[in-house]
């Protein structure tokens, strides 16, 4: 078994690399190292079990080449951090939605099951606790740049579910909530590692 992890040199992705290796799965990592770090993979690097491709998920040629070599895909690559989202909203939207579109098309082409990571931000301003995936969502004004991230991730979910609906591409969506832990950096505006 071999898995592709986009964003596999990032904070969450590097932990997934370790877990899959522990379960006997070989791993291909695709990461542009814009927020991921090579150091996150140094201690697990083994040419027979882990391969790192330094490139972007926005390149269909690269993504297709990676996807056809694996049995399943974990799509974690994304714009990261409040600072980037506020300072570069165009880059945020284009990289999130564009990258996910490229990954989903490649997975559909080669019939590879895919897990798409989303965010708790897609719940928006909902007042109901606990959150429910079936609840209606209330987002902030489009003039508030912070909502571009939540809306882009929601569009990722719509794209993934559309691929399931149209072609029965096996898709799982995981909404991550405020992840923290070793190897996380405060460099991109994350609060906990800053303290």
How should these model regions be labeled?
Residues 192-195:
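Short, intrinsically disordered, charge-balanced linker/junction segments flanking boundaries
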Residues 1-179:
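N-terminal Rossmann-like NAD(P)+-binding domain of SDR-like oxidoreductases, especially those catalyzing
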Residues 95, 182-189:
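Substrate-binding strand-loop-helix patch
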């Amino acid at each position: 078994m071999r898995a592709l992890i986009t964003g596999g040199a990032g904070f969450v992705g590097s932990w997934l690399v370790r877990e899959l290796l522990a379960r006997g799965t070989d791993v291909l990592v695709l990461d542009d190292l814009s927020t991921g770090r090579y150091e996150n993979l140094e201690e697990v690097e083994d040419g027979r079990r882990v391969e790192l491709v330094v490139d972007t998920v926005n390149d269909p040629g690269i993504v297709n080449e990676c996807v056809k070599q694996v049995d399943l895909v974990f799509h974690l690559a994304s714009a990261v951090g409040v600072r980037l989202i506020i300072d570069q909203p165009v880059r945020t939207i284009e990289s999130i939605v564009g990258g996910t579109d490229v990954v989903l098309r490649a997975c559909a082409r080669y019939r590879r099951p895919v897990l798409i990571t989303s965010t708790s931000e897609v719940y928006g301003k909902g007042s109901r606790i606990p959150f429910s995936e079936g609840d209606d969502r209330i987002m902030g004004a489009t003039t508030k740049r912070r909502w571009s991230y939540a809306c882009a991730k929601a569009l990722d979910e719509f794209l993934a579910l559309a691929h399931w609906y149209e072609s029965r591409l096996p898709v799982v969506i995981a909404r991550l909530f405020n992840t923290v832990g070793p190897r996380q950096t405060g460099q991109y505006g994350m609060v906990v590692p800053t303290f």
